From Swiss-Prot:
Main location: cytoplasm
UniProt keyword terms in alphabetical order: 4Fe-4S, Cytoplasm, Iron, Iron-sulfur, Metal-binding, S-adenosyl-L-methionine, Transferase
Residues involved in [4Fe-4S] cluster 2 binding: C142, C146, C149
Listed name of the protein: Ribosomal protein uS12 methylthiotransferase RimO
Domain TRAM: 360-427
Cofactor binding summary note: Binds 2 [4Fe-4S] clusters. One cluster is coordinated with 3 cysteines and an exchangeable S-adenosyl-L-methionine.
Domain Radical SAM core: 128-357
Named cofactor requirement(s): [4Fe-4S] cluster
NCBIfam families in UniProt: 30S ribosomal protein S12 methylthiotransferase RimO, MiaB/RimO family radical SAM methylthiotransferase
């Protein structure tokens, strides 16, 4: 039996991988500690998607090596995306590490730390999120060939998890107290196509909706061949959030072709119009990339105009990262870093104005909020239109109400900022 400190870096997909590992290891008697200094093994689940993530993973690994050198821990293992890309290089540069494991080597990781992999525990997880919400990873890998992305190299081909397995996993999460279920994958749009020849996403959402989760949220949809019946389900099912996260990346036809996105500007605009016509209450989140190779000032202005006209409810923007394992690495990274950052800032300044205007529409209204955190007489939570960690936060005064994390409360919104709603609790449930 060992005391293990697990550091899980990167995206929610990595979080689920770490949660599965913890459940397997705990079944073998392993104990997970809150702090590295209380452990004899450090295990780091790394991210290798973009340069910033790689640098964070390297920094945390070096910090763990120092603890081993100082004899504060006995062993250090590194797993996940970074070893999937750079196992040999990492092993050469960091001989102090006791083992490197890729993204599909869970049994090997468990064996290294003295635990046993058990097939019957495949659906079990120990949550790293607060106990009232969880992520359900419905597929692994990606078949898209977006030129800027190294995920197919890291995670492999797209493999949908069988519906019955997902329903078993979801049932266990519901029994444990999860009230909000967030469906994730690299691409949820094509869920089930490798199993049935067509998307099974809507069928899965309907079956999960019948399981009495209070909220079901869809994240990371791909715009090409998105199953539109899901939008109808959002409108018709009270516990399916009127919310869709659909990264679009750009609107310039030339850049979309170079990115190999499979959709042009006309198709993108028509898709958004169709989604909003079928469900006027839906809130759309998207992600853009600024500074893609060859992006001209005119193409960036086209992106700005598109965002201004479309008025997304939530939007993130990232500077293009020139990744050596992506197809776009053969292109010249010719937009200088300063210009990339300037373009990100300009786009986010525009979105801030849009977000402020949209948030003002909530002022004076009563809404339902899922409570994430309580500090003294203040509540921090989210509406159905806000995903964990990335979207708006509701900041509420509790008044005389006994509000606790995981509860739903009714709130009256009295003020707003671009990324927060402020108000007071007026009821529970």
């Amino acid at each position: 039996m060992h005391n293990i400190f697990l550091l899980s870096l990167g995206c929610s997909k990595n979080t689920v991988d770490s949660e599965r590992l913890m459940a397997q290891a705990a079944a073998s008697g392993m104990i997970f500690t809150e702090f590295a200094d209380d452990a004899d093994i450090i295990l780091i689940n790394t991210c290798g998607f973009i340069q910033d993530a790689k640098e964070e993973s390297i920094a945390e690994t070096l910090a763990a090596i120092r603890k081993k050198q100082d004899e504060k821990v006995r062993k250090v293992y590194v797993m996940g995306c970074l070893p999937e890309l750079y196992r040999k290089e990492l092993a050469d540069e960091m001989p102090e590490i006791d083992g490197f494991f890729g993204t599909r080597e869970l049994p090997d990781v468990l064996r290294a730390i003295g635990a046993e992999y058990r097939e019957e525990l495949l659906d079990r997880r120990i949550l790293l999120t607060p106990p009232h919400y969880a992520f359900l990873k419905i597929a692994e890998g990606c078949n898209r060939q977006c030129s800027f992305c190294s995920i197919p190299k890291i995670r492999g081909r797209y493999v949908s998890q069988p519906p019955e397995q997902l329903l078993r996993e979801a049932a266990l999460l519901r029994q444990s107290g999860v009230r909000e279920l967030n469906l994730i994958a690299q691409d949820i749009s094509v869920y089930g196509c490798d199993l049935d020849g067509s998307s099974l996403l809507n069928d899965l959402v309907l079956r999960l909706s019948d399981m009495e989760f209070e909220r079901i949220r869809l994240l990371y949809a791909y715009p090409l061949n998105f199953p539109m019946e899901v939008i109808d389900t959002m409108r018709e099912r009270e516990n399916v959030c009127n919310y869709l996260d659909m990264p679009l990346q750009h609107i310039s036809d030339r850049i979309l072709r170079s990115m190999n996105r499979g959709i042009d500007s006309t198709g993108t605009v028509r898709l958004i119009e169709s989604i909003r016509q079928r469900n006027p209450d839906i809130r759309l989140r998207t992600t853009m990339i600024a500074g893609y190779p060859g992006e001209t000032g005119e193409e960036f202005e086209e992106l700005l105009q598109f965002v201004a006209e479309t008025r997304f409810d939530r939007l993130g923007c990232f500077p293009y990262s020139h990744e050596e394992h992506s197809p776009a690495y053969r292109l010249e990274d010719d937009v200088i870093p300063e210009k990339k950052q300037d373009r990100v800032a300009e786009l986010m300044e525009l979105q801030e104005t849009i977000s402020q205007e949209k948030n003002r529409e909530f002022e004076g209204n009563e809404i339902v909020v899922l409570v994430d955190q309580v500090e003294e007489n203040m509540v921090f939570g989210r509406t159905e239109y806000d995903a964990p960690e990335v979207d708006n936060e509701c900041i509420l005064e509790t008044g005389n109400f006994d509000v606790r994390p995981g509860m739903f409360c009714r709130a009256r919104i009295t003020d707003s900022t671009p990324y927060d709603l402020e108000g007071e609790v007026i009821g529970i449930g």
